[in-house]
């Protein structure tokens, strides 16, 4: 049985003080959650949020990282530094990173491996554009991303990866994939993992849905057999909304 995982991606929102306020509001609301709870604040708020969540059931994710341990990479953050900070997860390959910062699958593969080298679990994002969905190539697109991004991992590592399926056309638009579409695509992603690493690994991998997840959508989404959680954007910025999703 896979433990559900609900992660809140705060994106470029919340100052340090606002992040602390949100965490303090959130802690009592999710303390009895059956799902694993993760929040991803901005880089400047990471240390504050890590310290504020100590002793709670909330884990902390970074929103991105570089694959090199150190060097002349102005503005980047190393996984080595994130490990020392006490970060548990790192979001990799979010569609905004792929789209606005030209992240490639080659770089993401290096990042996934570097995350494991520093005991940080990747939340690996994949998804298709509206054009790709309408051309009926969703499974080809996500399958290719997964094959490239997870290439060279051991079965043990692959089983720990969290995958987030996020149809790009549903992010921040208010549109969502139907529960059936999400379940079907996530099933196809799981099949790709099975082909790469075997059935046992595929059955362990947790795959989230991301794309305008709200308190009024989560219950039906989580009722689908392939969906193991959610990567939540805007709704994670309000403690009550995010708690309602966590406590689906």
UniProtKB/Swiss-Prot annotation:
Catalytic activity: D-glyceraldehyde 3-phosphate = dihydroxyacetone phosphate
Alphabetized PROSITE patterns for the sequence: TIM_1, TIM_2
EC number: 5.3.1.1
Gene3D superfamilies: Aldolase class I (3.20.20.70)
InterPro entries recorded: Aldolase_TIM, TIM_sf, TrioseP_Isoase_bac/euk, Triosephosphate_isomerase, Triosephosphate_isomerase_AS
Family to which this protein belongs: Belongs to the triosephosphate isomerase family.
Protein known as: Triosephosphate isomerase
Lineage, highest ranks first: Bacteria, Bacillati, Bacillota, Clostridia, Eubacteriales
């Amino acid at each position: 049985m896979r433990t559900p995982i609900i992660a809140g991606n705060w994106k470029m929102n919340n100052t340090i003080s606002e992040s602390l306020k949100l965490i303090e509001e959130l802690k009592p609301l999710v303390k009895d959650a059956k799902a694993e709870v993760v929040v991803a604040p901005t880089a400047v708020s990471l240390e504050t949020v890590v310290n504020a969540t100590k002793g709670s059931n909330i884990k902390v994710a970074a929103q991105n990282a570089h694959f090199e341990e150190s060097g002349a990479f102005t503005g980047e953050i190393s996984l080595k530094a994130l490990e020392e900070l006490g970060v548990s997860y790192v979001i990799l390959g979010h569609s905004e990173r792929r789209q606005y910062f030209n992240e490639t699958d080659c770089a993401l593969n290096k990042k996934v491996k570097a995350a494991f080298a520093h005991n940080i679990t990747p939340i690996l994002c994949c998804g298709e554009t509206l054009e790709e969905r309408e051309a009926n190539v969703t499974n080809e697109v996500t399958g290719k991303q997964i094959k490239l991004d997870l290439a060279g991992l051991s079965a043990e590592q692959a089983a720990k990866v969290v995958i987030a399926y996020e149809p790009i056309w549903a992010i921040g638009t208010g549109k969502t994939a139907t529960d059936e579409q999400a379940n079907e695509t996530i099933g196809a992603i799981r099949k790709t993992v099975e082909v790469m690493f075997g059935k046992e690994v595929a059955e362990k991998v947790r795959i989230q849905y991301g794309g305008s997840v709200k308190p009024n959508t989560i219950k039906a989404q989580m009722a689908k057999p392939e969906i193991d959680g959610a990567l939540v954007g805007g709704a994670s910025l309000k403690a009550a909304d995010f708690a309602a999703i966590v406590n689906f």
